[in-house]
């Protein structure tokens, strides 16, 4: 373990640094899933001073503040590390709530949007005269866990000294905890583990059900992508699986040349490459096109389905055309853009596991991989036989969980075994969890829908007045962004959330009295 003084230098930030073998998009290789987290509005993070509602000019909201948090909440003798947080007081009036977000598995300096009214956080603050905070998540591996992150939030809320008059502790002021994706799950887990610290909890696309085999990640894509594209993708995947699971080496070499230029990697590694074009679905938002964003997923489908000036029918063009078109698109986009200045086999499958032993600790991809390998799972695999699939069935728990974790952490895996997903669900409830004043919002088109409270694969989640569950026609955490109101169901849900929060805040004083009587 690093000495305490050095540890704090590493633990302050999630900023990834360049290391041998990384792709131009920061991933270790093409069979590592992109790390998606909180979505952002278009444009650079906001900077500069802001003006309070009373006309006072306040400090630059992009300036980070620093706060000491115990490295291990179970053994505080280990010392502390510095974490960064950002704050915006422009809407705050005495008595208003504190709207707090732990940004999860990211470098939080890019997430100051979440202390402005370009997000639901800021809209709540504007309506309720609240104070806005985003805090960076801890990053180092030995003490990187759900349980430690929950206590980080508690420790900050109970000990941070905010530059406003009055008592802003959670005993005297209502704190609203907001999170998305993993940090949305953390928000829900917080309600289960520490129900009386934060008054309101709001999880957007909260991935509350840990699953080792998460082939359902691709289900919302298959259900909602253009029918012709879906048909051709499924045809290509079925062909790739049939060939690679067979004995015709000539046919295998043909596929390897089409997608992997016959690089010296396994067939399952070649089959896994095709997910790269499918993964681009999660970059979509309701406003992507209108805001001039890149529609990479639809560019991929156009490459398959537009032949000259002719668009295929709903059943697609069929295997022969789709296979060649996909291979050509993959070569000129994914390989050409991501495998620059790197050996192709290394680009596809990474460097040997032993080279990962001394990897820098302040790497967000690796930090998040530690959490998935130890507590969540979520291997992005092919669907089982009998279920339609747009991903190769050669991608399994073996390739995408066991081998993946051993690649990143060879000193720990595979000896550790599978991720402790069942323990996580048992501890925090998964789909069965319930908490007072807990809001869930999920997207029907979100790749993470099947790990959320709106999963189609379960019927045990129930929306109630105290724990409302909304399903919008949006993507990953669309409800957090003000621009997403271009989609009517998102706009309606955002308005409902503002009304719900307002109603719950009106009950704050009576809640405090009830809590006092309980001796909490």
Task: Give a label for each model feature.
Residues 197-311, 319-322:
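A catalytic-pocket lid/entrance helix-loop region that shapes and gates access to the active site
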């Amino acid at each position: 373990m690093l000495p305490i003084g050095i540890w704090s230098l590493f633990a302050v930030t999630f900023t990834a640094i360049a290391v041998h073998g990384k792709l131009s998009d920061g991933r270790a290789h093409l069979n590592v899933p992109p790390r998606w987290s909180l979505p952002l509005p278009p444009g650079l993070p906001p900077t500069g001073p802001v003006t309070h509602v009373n006309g006072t000019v306040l400090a630059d909201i992009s300036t980070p503040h620093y706060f000491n948090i115990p490295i291990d909440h179970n053994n505080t003798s280990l010392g502390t590390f510095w974490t960064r947080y950002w704050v915006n007081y422009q809407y705050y009036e005495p008595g208003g709530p504190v709207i707090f977000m732990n940004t999860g598995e990211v470098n939080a300096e890019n997430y100051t949007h979440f202390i402005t009214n370009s997000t639901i956080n800021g809209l709540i603050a504007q309506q309720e005269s609240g104070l806005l905070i985003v805090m960076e998540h801890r990053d180092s591996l030995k003490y990187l866990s759900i349980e430690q992150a929950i206590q980080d939030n508690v420790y900050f809320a109970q000990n941070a000294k905010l530059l406003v008059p009055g008592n802003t502790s959670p005993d005297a002021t209502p704190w609203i905890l907001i999170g998305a994706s993993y940090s949305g799950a953390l928000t829900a887990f917080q309600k289960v583990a520490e129900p009386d610290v934060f008054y309101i909890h709001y999880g957007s696309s909260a991935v509350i059900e840990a699953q080792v085999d998460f082939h359902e990640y691709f289900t919302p894509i298959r259900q909602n992508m253009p029918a012709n594209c879906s048909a051709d993708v499924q045809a290509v995947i079925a062909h790739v699986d049939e060939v690679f699971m067979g004995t015709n080496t000539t046919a295998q070499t043909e596929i390897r040349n089409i997608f992997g230029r016959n690089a010296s990697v396994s067939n399952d590694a070649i089959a896994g490459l095709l997910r790269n074009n499918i993964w681009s679905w999660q970059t979509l938002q309701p406003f992507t096109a209108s805001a001039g964003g890149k529609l990479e997923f639809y560019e991929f489908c156009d490459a398959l389905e537009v032949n000259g000036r002719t668009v295929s029918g709903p059943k697609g063009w069929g295997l022969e055309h789709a296979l060649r078109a996909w291979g050509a698109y993959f070569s000129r986009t994914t390989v050409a853009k991501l495998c620059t200045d790197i050996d192709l086999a290394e680009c596809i499958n990474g460097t040997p596991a032993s080279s990962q032993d001394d990897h820098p600790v302040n790497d967000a991809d690796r930090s998040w991989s530690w959490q998935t390998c130890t507590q969540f799972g979520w291997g992005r695999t092919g669907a089982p036989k009998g279920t339609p699939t747009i991903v190769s069935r050669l991608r399994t728990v073996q390739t995408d969980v066991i081998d993946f974790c051993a690649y990143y952490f060879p000193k720990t895996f595979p000896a550790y075994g599978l991720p402790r997903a069942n323990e996580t669900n048992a501890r925090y409830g998964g789909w069965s969890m319930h908490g007072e004043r807990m809001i869930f919002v999920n997207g029907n088109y979100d790749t993470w829908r099947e790990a959320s409270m709106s999963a189609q694969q379960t019927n045990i989640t129930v929306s109630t007045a105290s724990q409302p569950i909304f399903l919008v026609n949006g993507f990953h955490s669309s409800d957090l962004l003000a621009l997403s109101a271009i989609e009517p169901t998102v706009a309606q849900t955002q308005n409902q959330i503002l009304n719900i929060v307002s109603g719950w805040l009106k009950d704050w004083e009576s809640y405090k009295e009830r809590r006092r009587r309980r001796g909490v």
